[in-house]
Design a protein with these regions (language model features):
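Short Gly/Pro-enriched turn/cap motifs at secondary-structure boundaries
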Residues: 114, 129-132, 156-159, 173-175, ...
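Short Ser/Thr-interspersed hydrophobic loop/turn segments at strand-loop and sheet-helix junctions
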Residues: 49, 73-77, 170, 186-191, ...
């Protein structure tokens, strides 16, 4: 059992730490304030090979493993969780299911678009009445000759109004429940595709979230991803992998908050000494550091298992649950150390705290993670 990162993974961390410090950190506050999609930085991440980094080299990707991807998301999210979210969604929720379930023709067409072609990807599962209970989805896909016709809508879609390629789930046979759900690769240029409401969110203001609407949307038959009726299984497998990305994002948020709080408390003098010298402050930081190390081990373990082709459902759920709750707790305690200043926008803690909350909700709430974990330990 080797807990040391390989040289390649160390280089990935170094590259992303430098990029985050030089490119992401300087615009993070403005990105949050204006709710602007960080387009220039995403283009730079395409050029660095981070977008679609786990795509095999023969399709234009870097051929990296899930651990490398998690490290990238962790580093980005230390300064801008929105950027980490955009990357995590593109890599884990769009590229990954095409890599895993796509035909050779689908991979040859879409994976180069999602890497060298600088096309952004998204994932369409959630509906207004189908959140945690994904099987309640009402979006329908009816086969009509050489194409499917999709009707319905999806909500809370990350990358929604900037993405070009979407992995979409729809009912092809409502009588079969989860076995009647199928997956499709849908382009934003397809007839009948449109973007609806742009969501105004509590946090992740730089992450473009929107409603996606299908009105007699024409999808070529060859864009069926996997087999008819296998969509629910594809969705659940994809979310397993996506949870590693959210765990890494949450871990990064927590680490960023801890760094900000440590720097502040070393310089903030009260009662004749820096508040970092008070034992209660030190104990709080000790707990933060301990939880970060535990979260990192859980996240990296899940990523390594995924990379080895082993079952990782339980481990991914544990990592996502632990790290998201760690992020919320750490940002709350870090903000408290800033006192009144922490409640202002002069410091990044209030943004980090707002960003942290969603990690307990999306890609499976904390409650759903506990359901997954309990179901995988023999209960």
């Amino acid at each position: 059992m080797d807990f040391n990162l390989s040289r390649e993974h160390q280089l990935v961390r170094k590259m992303m730490a430098e990029f985050t410090e030089n490119e992401v950190k300087p615009i993070a506050a403005e990105t949050d304030k204006t709710s602007q999609y960080p387009r220039e930085n995403i283009e730079k991440l395409f050029n660095l090979g981070v977008m679609g980094m786990c795509v095999p080299k023969e399709y234009g990707g870097a051929g990296a493993d899930p651990l490398a991807s998690a490290i990238c998301i962790e580093e980005l999210s230390m300064q801008c969780a929105s950027t980490g979210d955009i990357v995590a969604t593109h890599n884990g929720l769009c590229c990954d299911p095409i890599i895993t379930h796509g035909t050779e023709a689908q991979k040859a067409k879409y994976l180069p678009m999602l890497t060298k072609g600088h096309k952004v990807g998204a994932f369409c599962l959630t509906e207004s009445d189908a959140g945690s209970d994904a099987a309640k989805g009402q979006t329908e896909a009816k086969l009509d000759g050489d194409h499917y016709v999709l009707n319905g809508s999806k909500i809370f879609i990350t990358n929604g109004y900037v993405a070009d390629v979407f992995v979409v789930f729809a009912m092809t046979d409502k009588s079969k429940g989860t076995r009647g759900i199928s997956a499709f690769i849908v382009e934003s240029s397809f007839p009948g595709f449109s973007v609806g409401k742009h969501e105004e969110k509590m946090g992740l203001h730089g992450s473009p979230t929107a409603e996606i609407v299908f009105t007699d949307c024409i999808v070529p038959k060859e864009n069926l991803l996997g087999q008819e009726g296998k969509g629910f299984k594809i969705a659940m497998q994809t979310l397993d992998g996506g949870r590693i990305g959210i765990a890494a994002q949450a871990l990064g948020i927590a680490e960023g908050a801890m760094e900000e709080a440590m720097a502040y408390t070393k310089g903030r003098v009260q009662f004749g000494k820096p508040i970092s010298k008070f034992q209660n402050t030190q104990f709080t930081f000790a707990d933060m550091a301990m939880r970060s190390e535990a979260g990192r081990l859980l996240t990296y373990q899940a990523a390594v298992l995924k990379g080895e082709g082993k079952r990782f459902t339980k481990e991914a759920a544990m990592a996502k649950l632990f790290c998201s709750e760690h992020a919320m707790l750490t940002t709350t305690k870090a903000l408290q150390m800033f006192g009144g200043y922490g409640y202002t926008k002069d410091y990044p803690l209030e943004r980090m705290m707002r960003d942290a909350k969603i990690t307990e909700i999306y890609e499976g709430t904390s409650e759903i993670q506990r359901v997954v974990i309990s179901g995988n330990i023999g209960l």
